Amino acid sequence: MENETHYAEAVIDNGAFGTRTIRFETGRLARQAAGSAVAYLDDDTMVLSATSASKNPKDQLDFFPLTVDVEERMYAAGKIPGSFFRREGRPSEDAILTCRLIDRPLRPSFKKGLRNEIQVVATIMALNPDHLYDVVAINAASASTQLAGLPFSGPIGGVRVALIRGQWVAFPTHTELEDAVFDMVVAGRVLEDGDVAIMMVEAEATDKTIKLVEGGAEAPTEEVVAAGLDAAKPFIKVLCRAQADLAAKAAKPTGEFPIFLDFQDDVLEALTGAVKPELTQALTIAGKQEREAELDRVKGLAAEKLLPEFEGREKEISAAYRALTKSLVRERVIKEKKRIDGRGVTDIRTLAAEVEAIPRVHGSALFERGETQILGVTTLNMLRMEQQLDTLSPVTRKRYMHNYNFPPYSVGETGRVGSPKRREIGHGALAERAIVPVLPTREEFPYAIRQVSEALGSNGSTSMGSVCASTMSLLNAGVPLKAPVAGIAMGLISQEINGETHYVALTDILGAEDAFGDMDFKVAGTKEFVTALQLDTKLDGIPASVLAAALKQARDARLHILDVMMEAIDTPDEMSPNAPRIITVKIPVDKIGEVIGPKGKMINQIQEDTGADITIEDDGTIYIGAAQGSQAEAARATINGIANPTMPEVGERYLGTVVKTTTFGAFVSLLPGKDGLLHISQIRKLAGGKRVENVEDVLGVGAKVQVEIAEIDSRGKLSLIPVIEGEAGDDDKKDDADK
């Protein structure tokens, strides 16, 4: 039956943490797409994925035109969008990061040389607020693509695993993640021998990690992270099996798609004979710009020699040149343990670190690793300046914001500047996740923090350079980090020699090594543990021993980089005089209304009088920010006077202000929110003892008067008497004469 609905199910057993059920469905929704599938998590979260393919290939392209889009629908969480037009607009950061999580394992799974446009659209249609939809979307996208009749070597299973109370838990909820030491998304596919090939990892420690480790939890060291990858494999296997079951029932037969190979063997053979010695020599030049200039010259020489024979095949010559370059680079690494720039496999390029790189800003640092140069700049402000989020996530605000900019001049090119691309958003998010575990709490440091990483020069891992620059910049701004964090990019090259696969891990990879290697992974962390990890591989599985050794190699490099950074700055500096001063005061919750006042009158008055900026939290915590500390202290004193008053005592004297007059006396404000009555009989003393008919003849509103507390009744009402200097002299005699 053409529109028959098919189902498959994957049950994830988390032991003491219960089970999660991922159910796949096809045939009911989006039937005109080449392939469509719905993935449900516990029948409470629903993601629809539709995969479409263009009828004709884009043969003029030299890359595979795959597009992945994630559409967050606010109705999924029972919300109306907060924008002016009340409809969804540009994708959120969560949606963009999920696009990248889907793209990274999907792209290498299509047949090499495919040039038909492929689009995968994942729509979040229902969401339990305690669920995370990103891994559900990975599985839905894989399932819909598997059904579409495309040359695709799936299925791909995606799982989030979190280390909670010593156990790796799959598909954890937001609530469970509150107790997680480490959290990672792992995607992979099942090989013919039954093993799981890990294709992609995105992992991070949490903002609770340090506290949990101090409480006795296991720290996320390299060994623990490697164990987590192994723990994810059985879950991936279950998910792939369910997708394969669905595909067996409903997948279209694989269609005929033209494959455009980058080049034919005859071009590569001719090119090798023409320029291999010159190319080999060019690849030994250490400097990036000099090397690229020589490579361009050799490429021009190759075209000059080959074009007469291969007329009209310029693209093939260019692609073959790249393939030969890749082959020579890899061969040298495997055989000689030497790299493009002459380094050994574990060598790090020259490092440089400095703080206070630019004037006036709240904190800044410059970090250089070879030709990679990153400027980190920190800005501090009131907590009300933290980012407000209108997304499907239950997280509605973000105090630490990390933005990453990659201008075209960083690689010596021209190009568009302006709004960030997906890559920039992804790199910024990776650097942000690396830093979050070591940030002080809101209570310890009540500031909104914006960190900007400017990639001023790029030749290998600007994202990990951003982590290093950010650590130093934050310390320079006076942020009391729990530990410094550094990051390093690693690569892996493998080659089969005499039937045995040899692996070589490379520390601190160049941009070219990233492109020519089999795996690249970025590791950030403190001296004690890993805070963030990103891994992508083109291999069908990496032996656990190789991965463990590569992670240890990365740790050695990270410790060396931390030593260099700590020479530049090892403790938080004094805060910049240009940064706002923020202090906190805690008041009883039932006093919040008094501090705000009717229609905000009191809080507005305090802000106007002191020049401070005041933010009140629901729990009674008040954050007071001002350009100068004295302004913040003045606001704190006023607030304490209202909400945390020191009860006046009999006999205390105050210079008060008349705030109201009546027929029987004047009310005098002694402290904010604390008034007393100066009775008309006492006001006579201020009038020389004469009878007072009208209080305002002696004291008007706003008048200052020195008073003493004469009595406090059972209800806390204050009775005042005036303090008159030298009142025992002539005034008393004059009073007697009048009588």
Swiss-Prot record:
One Gene Ontology MF term: magnesium ion binding
Protein name: Polyribonucleotide nucleotidyltransferase
InterPro entries: ExoRNase_PH_dom1, ExoRNase_PH_dom2_sf, GPSI/PNP, KH_dom, KH_dom_type_1, KH_dom_type_1_sf, NA-bd_OB-fold, PNPase
Annotated localization: Cytoplasm
Classification via PANTHER family: POLYRIBONUCLEOTIDE NUCLEOTIDYLTRANSFERASE (PTHR11252), POLYRIBONUCLEOTIDE NUCLEOTIDYLTRANSFERASE 1, MITOCHONDRIAL (PTHR11252:SF0)
EC id: 2.7.7.8
Record keywords, A-Z: Cytoplasm, Magnesium, Metal-binding, Nucleotidyltransferase, RNA-binding, Transferase
Major localization class: cytoplasm
Superkingdom of origin: Bacteria
Domain S1 motif: 651-723
